[in-house]
A protein has these predicted regions:
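Acidic catalytic loop of the alpha/beta-hydrolase fold
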Residues: 156-160, 185
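Primarily recognizes the serine-hydrolase "nucleophile elbow" in alpha/beta-hydrolase
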Residues: 30-85
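Short beta-strand/loop motif that positions the catalytic acidic residue
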Residues: 145, 151-153
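Catalytic active-site module of serine/aspartate enzymes centered on a nucleophile-bearing elbow/loop
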Residues: 186, 193-224
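Short alpha-helix in the alpha/beta-hydrolase fold that links the catalytic acid
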Residues: 147, 160-170
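Accessory cap/linker subdomain of secreted extracellular hydrolases
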Residues: 66-139
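Alpha/beta-hydrolase active-site loop
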Residues: 14-33
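Cap/lid segment of the alpha/beta-hydrolase catalytic domain
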Residues: 1-19, 189-202
Length: 224
């Protein structure tokens, strides 16, 4: 998910930019088409949705794009909301520092130091990736996609709330939209509306993907 445990080995990401992932996705689409797959559908989850939007612009081999819990606003806005939900009301100073760091990265400026609590998020070795990612607006990118699009959000997603799906659908009126009742950010069903209630959805690998999501995506692909 955006802004959470982004890199487990940050030193390996020192030179990576979002465009690398976009290029990889486009290359895979080309490869699969060359292997005889008649329709290649890119399905992106969370930040992967933005990658899918951009990759679909780079190759004619993509037949459709599916956005699952994808951000509908620029990354800095999403990050500010996520951090606010975690840090307020007790850590206002830390939130302000995080927002200042994010603003600097969006201007293309590297940050030499940050509070220890934010070190994992803004580690110097991943700042190049942050800077590249902050240049994109998902609403602008989805407007450029010319193939069929399905935008899916979960009404119990605490990381990327369903208004993000609404924003994407508004930016690209041709897109089909579906809001899945009870679906969380990890694409699993949960009735609890608090972060602590959703621990299982994030940590229990035995929980299945929301069957309503599977049905919606399957119907979309079969209809292409």
């Amino acid at each position: 998910g955006i802004g959470a445990s982004r890199f487990t080995e940050p030193e390996k990401m020192a030179d990576a930019v979002l465009g690398d992932f976009i290029g990889d996705a486009a290359a895979w689409a080309d490869y699969l088409a060359g292997e005889g797959f008649r329709r290649v559908v890119l399905i992106g989850h969370s930040e992967g949705a933005l990658i899918a939007f951009c990759a679909a612009q780079q190759t004619p081999k993509v037949a459709a794009v599916v956005s699952l819990a994808g951000a509908g606003y620029p990354l800095d806005e999403i990050l500010q909301l996520q951090l606010a939900s975690q840090l307020l009301p007790d850590n206002m100073d830390l939130l302000l520092q995080a927002n200042a760091i994010t603003a600097a990265l969006k201007r293309g400026e590297r940050v030499e130091s940050c509070p220890p609590q934010l070190e994992a998020l803004f580690h110097p070795s991943v700042q190049t990736f942050w800077i590249s990612s902050l240049r994109y607006d998902p609403r602008e990118e989805i407007r450029k996609v010319r193939v069929p699009i399905l935008v899916v959000g979960g009404d119990n997603d605490l990381q990327v709330p369903p208004d993000n799906a609404e924003a994407l659908a508004k930016a690209q009126p041709r897109a089909r939209k579906a809001i899945i009742a009870g679906m969380t950010h990890p694409l699993k069903k949960c009735t609890g509306r608090m972060r602590i209630d959703q621990t299982g959805a994030y940590g229990d690998s035995t929980l299945p993907i929301d069957p309503d999501l599977v049905a919606v995506v399957t119907q979309f692909i079969r209809g292409l």
